[in-house]
């Protein structure tokens, strides 16, 4: 997402990205990337770094790409104190399933402390699908919502060259409870006889404790020969997985878009996903299956 956004916006304007250092940094063309310290409300290092960047960059517009992080809310506050317009893109983080998860212990305190104000004060909210816009309107905090769909650089993605069955199914996304990987494991357990000779590859990074719980679930069901958790994959290895798999499977509870779905289709690999995504066209276009969990 940021690679495509930075590349294209950078052709039209001067683009700066404020972020934290990553173990797997992505090259983004036509923009300047600024790594800042991790937000800490006790010391002022993060605030000072961001303030200095604002003084140097003097932005005309700030585009915030997250929710539920005090650092993002702080950057929005700093921008609006300087009379800089702010666009907030929740990326599905304000979908009902997400808000309900840990509502009393995490979401409600965050809403009261900073997140509700951030949504209300944003000059514009960007939704990436009609379903996301409808849910943002139901939330009732800000009605100035525009739909700007996400996209991928399809021309740079190589189509698979063989449609011969590889007997490989692929999950490639963040390893998080929202993604419904447990349903994939349960389905494999039910269909273990039909899946003899198949591999289900689960690619992605996630919280160590959650990854460990999935591995334990796989062991408890005796599915070690079928399901493999391989960690995060990037670059050529990622595209190789898309191109060599028979299906891409994303059994998610909720997605505002699902970039990996678009990437799989661009690679020529059909997709099985849920009604928690806005990809109902999969059924009508015979490109996969859009199903209830």
Regions found by a protein language model. Give the residues of each.
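Short hydrophobic beta-strand element within catalytic cores of glycosyltransferases
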Residues: 270-273
């Amino acid at each position: 997402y940021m690679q495509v956004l930075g590349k294209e916006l950078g052709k039209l304007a001067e683009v700066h990205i404020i972020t934290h250092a990553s173990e797997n940094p992505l090259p983004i063309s036509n923009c300047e990337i600024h790594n800042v310290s991790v937000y800490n409300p006790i010391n002022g290092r993060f605030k000072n770094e961001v303030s200095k960047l604002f003084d140097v960059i003097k932005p005309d517009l700030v585009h915030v790409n997250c929710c539920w992080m005090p650092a993002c809310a702080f950057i929005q506050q700093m921008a609006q104190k300087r009379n800089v317009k702010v666009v907030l893109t929740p990326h599905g983080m304000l979908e009902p399933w997400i808000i309900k998860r840990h509502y009393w212990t995490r979401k409600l305190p965050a809403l009261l402390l900073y997140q509700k104000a951030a949504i209300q004060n944003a000059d514009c909210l960007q939704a990436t699908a009609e379903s996301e816009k409808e849910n943002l309107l139901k939330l009732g905090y800000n009605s100035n919502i525009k739909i700007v769909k996400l996209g991928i650089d399809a021309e740079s993605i190589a189509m698979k060259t063989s449609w011969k069955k590889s007997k490989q199914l692929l999950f490639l996304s963040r390893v998080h409870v929202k993604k419904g990987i447990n349903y994939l494991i349960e389905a494999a357990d039910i269909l273990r006889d039909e899946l003899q000779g198949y591999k289900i590859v689960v690619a992605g990074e996630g919280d160590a404790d959650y990854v460990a719980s999935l591995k334990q679930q796989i062991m408890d069901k005796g599915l070690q020969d079928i399901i493999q958790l391989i960690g995060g994959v990037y670059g050529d290895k990622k595209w190789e997985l898309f191109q060599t798999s028979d299906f891409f499977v994303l059994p998610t509870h909720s997605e505002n878009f699902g970039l990996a779905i678009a990437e799989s289709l661009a690679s020529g690999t059909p997709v099985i996903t849920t009604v928690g995504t806005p990809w109902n066209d999969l059924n009508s276009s015979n490109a996969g299956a859009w199903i209830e969990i």
